[in-house]
Amino acid sequence: MRPYVILNAAMTLDGKIATATGSSEISGEEDLRRVHELRRECDAIMVGINTVLADDPRLTVHRVDAAPGDNPVRVVVDSMARTPPHFRVLNDEAPTVIGVSESAPPERVAELRKRAEVVVAGTRRVDLHLLLERLHGMGIERLMLEGGSTLNYSMLTGGLVDEVRVCIAPMIVGGRDARTLVDGEGIDEMADAIRLELKRSYTLGEDLIVEYTVKG
Ligand SMILES: NC(=O)c1ccc[n+]([C@@H]2O[C@H](COP(=O)([O-])OP(=O)(O)OC[C@H]3O[C@@H](n4cnc5c(N)ncnc54)[C@H](O)[C@@H]3O)[C@@H](O)[C@H]2O)c1
Ligand SMILES: Nc1nc(=O)c(N)c(NC[C@H](O)[C@H](O)[C@H](O)COP(=O)(O)O)[nH]1
């Protein structure tokens, strides 16, 4: 058993979720409120370690009203336990789970255990199936996946995503080194693409929101 997973992201019209230099303010004000409402409805928010290192996110509900207990559990996928102990994802605003692999240096794991629950899953990379199973065992039934591109790819190709919600902002930045909604190794044949079904589309200010379910 695993949680129901909603992938949420904001991208430019050309599919970038950050520029090559890591600048990533894409969503408009209204979309950011939508994101935080979605955070409030979920039991956990999951991101990859590169997103933590790039943005130092809080991963809490802070743009809409929230009672202290409304903050979801924060989950970082971090094979080598590189989450810096002073980063905001480890503050006391919400509980945090760090998913590491068996290859993570024990001294860094011990340091993280002072501030978070550490789940060891996988030998070199985090085994996402196993991590999600463990999260479900902790009572997490609805999980919001907030990127980045590399984790999005692994989660989608692992068959671990149920819905995709994307904010398309009216911006274009280009750049072959800029992260896109989904990177990773990529699928070779279009016939093998992950198929989605469009459920809803609407505008929020200048942004276009598109919501899909992933076909099983
Ligand atoms: N616009 C948005 O909605 C949005 C959202 C999130 C992140 N971002 C941006 O995305 C960028 C980071 O994306 P990224 O692709 O570099 O990194 P990421 O956040 O997807 O982290 C990927 C890393 O996670 C670790 N990992 C461990 N096990 C893994 C597994 N099984 N599968 C995949 N990764 C695994 C690896 O170290 C891997 O390099 C940042 O610039 C950030 O600002 C944008
Ligand atoms: N929906 C969305 N629109 C954006 O324009 C953007 N840059 C992100 N990025 C998601 C990523 O996880 C960010 O790191 C957090 O949004 C940081 O913000 P918080 O401190 O957690 O509120 N997400």
Curated annotation (Swiss-Prot):
This is 2,5-diamino-6-ribosylamino-4(3H)-pyrimidinone 5'-phosphate reductase. Belongs to the HTP reductase family. SUPFAM superfamilies: Dihydrofolate reductase-like. GO terms for biological process: riboflavin biosynthetic process. The keyword Oxidoreductase applies. Pathway: Cofactor biosynthesis; riboflavin biosynthesis. It catalyses: 2,5-diamino-6-(1-D-ribitylamino)pyrimidin-4(3H)-one 5'-phosphate + NADP(+) = 2,5-diamino-6-(1-D-ribosylamino)pyrimidin-4(3H)-one 5'-phosphate + NADPH + H(+); 2,5-diamino-6-(1-D-ribitylamino)pyrimidin-4(3H)-one 5'-phosphate + NAD(+) = 2,5-diamino-6-(1-D-ribosylamino)pyrimidin-4(3H)-one 5'-phosphate + NADH + H(+). It is an enzyme of class 1 (oxidoreductase). NADP(+) binds at T51, D55, S79, M80, A81, R82, V126, G148, S149, T150, L151.
